[in-house]
Amino acid sequence: PRSTPNPSSAASDVYKRQTQYRETDWDFLTRLLAESGLAWRYEHTQRGVGAGADDSDPGHTLVIFDADAELPSPVRLRFHRADASEAEDSITALGERRELVPNRSVASSWHSERVEAVSGEAAAAHHDAIPTLEVYVQPRAGRFADPAHASEEATFRLDAARLRGWRLEGAGSARVLAAGQPISIAQHPRHGGATLVPLAVEHVGTNNLGSGITALLASPDLEHGSYRNRFVATPVEVPVAPLAADRPTVHGPQTAHVVGLPDAAVTPSRDHQVRIQFAWQRGEHPNPGGLSAGSHAPGDHTSGTWVPVAEWLAGPNWGSHFLPRIGAEVLVEFLHGDIDQPRITGQLYNGDVAPPFAAGIDGGANHPGTLSGLHTRGHDGGGTQQWVIDDTPGQLRTRLHTTLADSRLELGYLIEHGDHHRGSLRGQGVELATAGWGNVHAAQGLLLSTTARPDGASTQMDMAEAVAQLKGAERTAEALHDTLRQQAVPGLDANERLVALREAVDPDVDGAYRGNVAGQPAMKPGGGGGRQP
C-alpha cells in the first residue's frame, strides 16, 4: 500500500478505541478510512514493465488519498465509436445525471469529560433558488477533540453527499479505465475537454475460443473476442470522498472481566472508569478458557481503554460510588449498539463469586432470602464491612458492622448474626457495641431517657416527662433543704444547680429555640392553630 495524502491536510485521527466486530478485515479497514475522509484506489502495472520494475513487482498497489491529494495526470480518451478498424480505445456513450443533495452538514458529539457538545459544520455554495438542505449527524460520544475536528467530519460527509449530486455515466472500450484514474474527454459535443474521475468501472470481456466452447459461453450482448466496459464518474472539481460505512451493531449486552495493575484490588480513573477484557478477546492473557494469540488480550491495565461505570446516583460531588474490582464479572451495554461505546451497567455473581447473603434453593441458609444489604472486603483481602437489612416478617432488623474492633450498631429484632444464618433471639431494641474505645459527643446537649411515649408523638427534643421528673426532684430537694436548715444542719448547696439544669431543658424557660429554621417556625403546631415550644 502507498499513502498519498496532501501534506496540508489535517493529521489522521488517533483513536482511543477501535474494535473489529463481526466484520472482515477489509470492511474494518475501509470503514476506518471512510471515517477519516480517506478514499482509496488500485494502481495496476504489468509485471516487469516500466522504469525500475522487475519480476518481483506484484503489479497492484493500494493507494490511499484524501480530497486534497493530487491525482495522477488524466488519460485522454475520445468520444468515438468502437470498431475493429479504430486504432485507439474510445468512449461510446456518456450521459450526465444531477441529483438534489444536502448542501450543509453539521456534526456534533457529546464529550462527557468536558461536559459539553463539540460541534462543527460545513456548507457548499448553491443556487439561490435551492433552499438550505441540512444533514445533522451525532457520531459516538467523545468523537471530536475540538470544533475543528467536528468541522472536518462535517466536510467529509458533505463531500460524500456531493458525489451523488453530479455524476456522469458512460460506456466504451477503453481498457485503461480504472477507478481513481482521471480521464480527459475529447470530441464530445458537451463534455469535450472535461476531466472526470471514475468512481467505479465494470469490465466485460469474452474470449475467442472455438465454436463449441463459444456456444456454451454465448452472450447475446457482446461479440466473442471483444471487450466493453461501463463506468460512473464525477467531474474533477467535485472532491472524491468515501461514503460513510455502517458500523457493526451489537445486539444486546455482553459480559467482561475487569482488569488492572498486577496485585491491585482495583485500578480506576478519576472519572469512575475501569478497564475490561471481553471473553472473546484472544491474546497473551485471555480470560480463563479463552484462546491465545499474539496480542489484544493482555489481561492487565493495558487492555483497551477506560470504560465508564454506571451508578444509581451521580452528581457534582454526590451520588453512589461502587467500583467493580479486578477479576469481577461485569455486564456491559453499548450506546446505540456501537461496539466502541461500552458502558458498565452492573456486576454479576458467578460460579467463583457467590453473593454474601446466599440463600434460596441449594443455598445452605436457614432463611428463604430475607437478608439484603451491602458487604465489602478490604483491598488487602482482610476484614469486612456490612449493612444488613433483615425483612423477616415480624422480626425486622438493621445491622451496621465492621470487623475492626468488632464494632456494630443493631436496631430492631436482635439475634445472633451470621452471613448465611439467622441465630437465636437476644432481645429487641437497639444495641451499640465495640471491642475498642467509644465516645459520644453532643455540642448542644445530650438526653438519655428510659421514658417511652406511645406512638412516638411530638418532636425530637420534647422532654416533658424529664422536665416533670426534674421539677419533682427539685421540690423534694427544697423540702429536704428546708428541714435540714430548721435542724441547724447545713442545707443542700447543689439545689441551685438542679434548678439551672431544669430551666435549661424546660421549653417554657430556656429549653426552646424561638427563631426560624430554614424559613420555618421552630415551634411545633399547638391547639387553636397556634404554636408552642
Explain the meaning of each model-derived region.
Residues 1, 9-533:
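Amphipathic alpha-helical and helix-coil boundary elements used as assembly
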